[in-house]
């Protein structure tokens, strides 16, 4: 190479910044170390969490000193350049060669011990030494070695972390679910187990086996999932792979839970996998539609072609999501949207009417946990990419979508308008205590959230007023009040008079309220407004208002924005709706799910015969 007079250099400070940015979250550290154990052909990796240290040990092939220097301690080592498969034939999970950053990101001291071919060795990394090297502009760091007489490891690799920077907290309880949901290789006939504090992770640690009501599995190879869930009511097979997916294998399942509250915010509940490891937590993040069903969605989609050795890395640098513009992702996204979600949207409402929606009301014996006792009925559903329906008879007749109260918008997205259909059957009404409990649960959800206190207090006040409206004012007032809360949560900044201005902007609102003008002091208190609405609006008006709220939040305000632009009082409402379109609060989904649940209970208790 000719001497051009230029050179590219790196500082240890780069290492420091990368570790803090990519692996400051302790969960990412665990994910990386479990993946490393898999790549080392381990059959077992143990994690022991103590108050002042974390110990991770596997029984893999181990590292030699040369391996440690050229692979483990080398930033940017490309694992798959050596081989895409391990000695035992496993596909390698690691790719970028930045695993060492996982250690630097969460601990100040790391002891690493390994033994390969009967030769043990060990070294100790001190974050403080690296930081001192940064101040001295040092470009090379040499960990201190462990004397041979102090080595006791006989096989595999052992890492001990001390001076943990992240709070361990209730680590064991949440870590089981975290790992169980982010790897498909654990306890899945892959000869690989993860043990936390001497107790192996099992399928129950996924914490949703008894929560899935309906299941759609992808191809015959995924039919095992029909026997996986303990309270499953019905399962369907989606056999069509979709246009443009030739040569690509997609496996897994999508299900719907009994209640939105069965899906906790802090855990991933619909995930993309490749080669047994999570590559993106949210399947629906780039799929927008107005269907209520999506609040109930849970699932796992396995697409190994998304992490092909022969193509560019599709995962972002933080290893948490897929690059949105990659053609492979766009094809998969289209398949999920057309051939999976439309199928679910067109059948879910009918299934919910046909089967009970509360598993707690059913008596389930311990024997029901066995695979053979599962009462699910299997049906094959051939998903058609040019049809938005898939009923029990696998009909592609477009009228089926209308019967199931799902309609297709101009842009091809499916709207689920069934939530407020007048033909809702009248099941045994839930006790009023159940509705009261739902309000109480929602209040607790808000109280325990991390939203600003001022906003939290306003939302809590509105929940209480909605409860009062239900008890003594008007069912219709309660519904509109809940819609106002729903809107307010998504706005992020709530002004009580904004709800009046918002209602004025909707063309469905009767003229008497429109004539009041914006921000009328008489209606500054939502209780008064709710009382007025309860005596002025028809039941259909209330349904349309709350339906627009639900539709608008799910579609990030796109439809509402258009409505507001054409309204007689756009003003600050347009500004607020733009805020809604940008709003991305991680807790909002949970609030909305609970609101849907409460509204559903209220509607069941007060059937649509109210004038």
UniProtKB/Swiss-Prot annotation:
Gene Ontology terms: biological process: DNA restriction-modification system
SUPFAM superfamilies cross-referenced by the UniProt entry: ATPase domain of HSP90 chaperone/DNA topoisomerase II/histidine kinase (SSF55874)
Region (2.5 X 11 AA tandem repeats): 382-403
Gene Ontology molecular function, alphabetical: endonuclease activity
Taxonomic path: Bacteria, Bacillati, Chloroflexota, Chloroflexia, Herpetosiphonales
Residue ranges with Basic and acidic residues bias: 355-364
Annotated protein name in UniProt: Putative type II restriction enzyme HgiDII
Class of the enzyme per the UniProt entry, highest EC level: hydrolase
Entry keyword set: Endonuclease, Hydrolase, Nuclease, Repeat, Restriction system
Per-repeat ranges for Sequence: 382-392, 393-403, 404-409
Catalytic activities: Endonucleolytic cleavage of DNA to give specific double-stranded fragments with terminal 5'-phosphates
EC number: 3.1.21.4
Function: No restriction activity was detected upon overexpressing this protein in E.coli.
Region of interest: Disordered: 355-434
Compositional bias annotation for Acidic residues: 410-425
Biased composition regions of type Low complexity, renumbered to the chain: 381-409
Keyword Transferase: no
């Amino acid at each position: 190479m000719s001497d051009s007079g230029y050179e590219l250099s790196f500082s240890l400070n780069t290492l420091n910044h990368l570790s803090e940015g990519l692996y400051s979250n302790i969960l990412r550290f665990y994910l990386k170390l479990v993946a490393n154990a898999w790549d080392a052909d381990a059959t077992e990796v143990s994690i022991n969490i103590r108050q002042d240290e974390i110990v991770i040990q596997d029984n893999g092939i181990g590292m030699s000193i040369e391996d440690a220097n050229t692979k483990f301690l080398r930033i940017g080592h490309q694992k798959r350049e050596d081989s895409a498969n391990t000695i035992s034939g496993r596909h390698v999970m690691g790719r970028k060669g930045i695993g060492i950053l996982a250690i630097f990101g969460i601990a100040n001291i790391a002891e690493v011990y390994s033994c390969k071919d009967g030769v043990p060795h060990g070294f100790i990394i001190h974050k403080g030494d690296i930081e001192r090297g940064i101040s001295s502009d040092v470009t090379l760091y040499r960990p201190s070695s462990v004397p041979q007489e102090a080595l006791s490891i006989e096989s595999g690799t052992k890492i001990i972390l001390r001076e943990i920077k992240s709070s361990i907290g209730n680590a064991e309880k949440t870590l089981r679910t975290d790992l169980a949901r982010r790897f498909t290789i654990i306890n899945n006939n892959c000869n690989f187990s993860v043990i936390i504090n001497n107790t192996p992770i099992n399928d129950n640690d996924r914490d949703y086996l008894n929560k899935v009501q309906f299941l759609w599995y992808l191809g015959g190879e995924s039919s095992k999932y029909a026997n996986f869930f303990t309270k499953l009511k019905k399962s369907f097979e989606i056999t069509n792979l979709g246009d443009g997916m030739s040569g690509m294998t997609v496996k897994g399942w999508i299900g719907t839970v009994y209640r939105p509250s069965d899906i906790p915010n802090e855990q991933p509940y619909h995930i993309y996998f490749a080669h047994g490891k999570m590559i993106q937590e949210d399947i629906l993040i780039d799929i927008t539609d107005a269907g209520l069903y999506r609040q109930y969605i849970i699932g796992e989609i396995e697409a190994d072609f998304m992490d092909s050795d022969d193509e560019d890395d599709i995962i972002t640098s933080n290893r948490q999501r897929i690059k949105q513009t990659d053609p492979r992702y766009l094809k998969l996204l289209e398949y999920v949207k057309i051939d999976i979600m439309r199928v679910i949207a067109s059948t879910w409402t009918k299934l919910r009417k046909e089967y009970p929606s509360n598993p707690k009301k059913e008596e389930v014996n311990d024997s029901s946990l066995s695979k053979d006792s599962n009462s699910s009925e299997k049906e094959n559903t051939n998903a058609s990419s040019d049809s938005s329906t898939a009923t029990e008879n696998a009909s592609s007749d477009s009228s089926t979508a209308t019967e199931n109260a799902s309609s297709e918008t101009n842009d091809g997205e499916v709207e689920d308008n069934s939530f407020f259909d007048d033909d809702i059957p009248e099941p045994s009404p839930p006790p009023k205590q159940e509705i009261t409990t739902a309000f109480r649960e929602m209040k607790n959800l808000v109280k325990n959230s991390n939203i600003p206190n001022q906003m939290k207090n306003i939302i809590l006040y509105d929940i209480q007023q909605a409860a009062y409206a239900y008890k003594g004012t008007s069912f219709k007032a309660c519904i509109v009040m809940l819609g106002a809360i729903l809107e307010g949560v998504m706005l992020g900044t709530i002004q009580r008079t904004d709800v009046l201005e918002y209602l004025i902007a909707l063309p469905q609102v009767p003229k008497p309220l429109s004539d009041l003008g914006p921000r009328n002091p008489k209606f500054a208190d939502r209780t008064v407004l709710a009382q007025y609405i309860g005596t002025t609006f028809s039941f259909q008006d209330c349904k349309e208002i709350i339906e627009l709220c639900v539709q608008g939040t799910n579609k990030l305000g796109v439809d509402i924005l258009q409505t507001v632009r054409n309204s007689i009082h756009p003003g600050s409402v347009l500004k607020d709706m733009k805020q809604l379109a940008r709003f991305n609060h991680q807790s909002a989904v949970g609030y909305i799910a609970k609101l849907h649940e409460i509204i559903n209970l209220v509607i069941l208790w007060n059937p649509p015969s109210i004038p």
